[in-house]
Amino acid sequence: MDKAMKITRRQCQLAFFSAAVVVICVCIGVTMNLTTVADENFDHMGLRTFCMFTVNSNILCAAAMAMVIPYTLDGLRTHNYHMPRWIVDLVYMGVTAVALTFLVSLFILSPAKGFVLIFTGSRFFLHGVCPLLAIVAFCFFMSEKRLTFRDMLLALIPVLIYTIVYYVMVAVVGEEKGGWNDFYGFLSRLPHWIPLSAIMPLTFLIALGIRVLHNRSYDRRKAAESAFYTALFADADVRKIVAALARSHSSAKILDIVIPTRVISIMLEHSKSDCTLEECCEIYLKEYLENSQVLNLEKYWI
């Protein structure tokens, strides 16, 4: 059982550290842009930096990663790592957006402006480190849920919104009337229909690639977990294991009693026991209370 807990703990640790590094690096990159008064190569510094897709995509990704952190910490505390579907979808959106940022920077902006220019300064974080780390983290450390076709369509929404806003501000409003200049150069150097017809199919392919990597990681992890838990619990007495698990957790001096239903469900799924989840939860709670070191709660009543 200790090994099962270690698997969950390692997954939580990797997800926590990768999410935290993405958040920190995005904060560094955006702060560098905000505090740069002028840049001879990029005119969108200071508050104008929020016009750029690079910055907005990284902020979205960092915000989504920040929402992952509380669930990883809770997983470390309770040994029951779980993320809601809506957070998985939000992270998927952010990762798809920064993946587009990375690929455009690498294959379009770098040949035009030079690799060193595109991947130095704040752009080292926003064009390179954050997108790559976010992709790796989501595909390999946060593959707790399988991505569906619906999830993939949702991942396209941020890029679609920015595409519409960019076109309106550049081509419809125009810089002379308070809009934006074509700082990416896609509309001034090419017929409008080319970038407009290419951006969403490209984003779709990126989202598809991320989904394939994520789901393969999910399938591998589930297969490994299934083999491990089947070997561990096939002939085991689940009732005794749940009781032992409760006794080991009861030594922790915490007031909230958290029953690890996910772990118990996995045990039941891979065992031949006739015990139900409800019965296991009752066994856990009873054993926990009988062995808990925090039974005197009178001083905590308000």
Residue ranges of model-derived segments:
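Membrane-interface transmembrane-helix boundary segments in multi-pass integral membrane proteins
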Residues: 51, 171-213
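Interfacial segments of alpha-helical transmembrane regions
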Residues: 79-97, 148-156
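Short, highly charged, low-complexity non-transmembrane loops/tails of multi-pass membrane proteins
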Residues: 218-232
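Non-cytosolic membrane-interface motifs at loop->transmembrane helix junctions
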Residues: 44-52, 114-126, 150-151
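Juxtamembrane "helix-exit" motif on the non-cytosolic side of transmembrane helices
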Residues: 31-40, 106-115
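Alpha-helical transmembrane segments in multipass membrane proteins, preferentially the mid-helix core
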Residues: 131-148
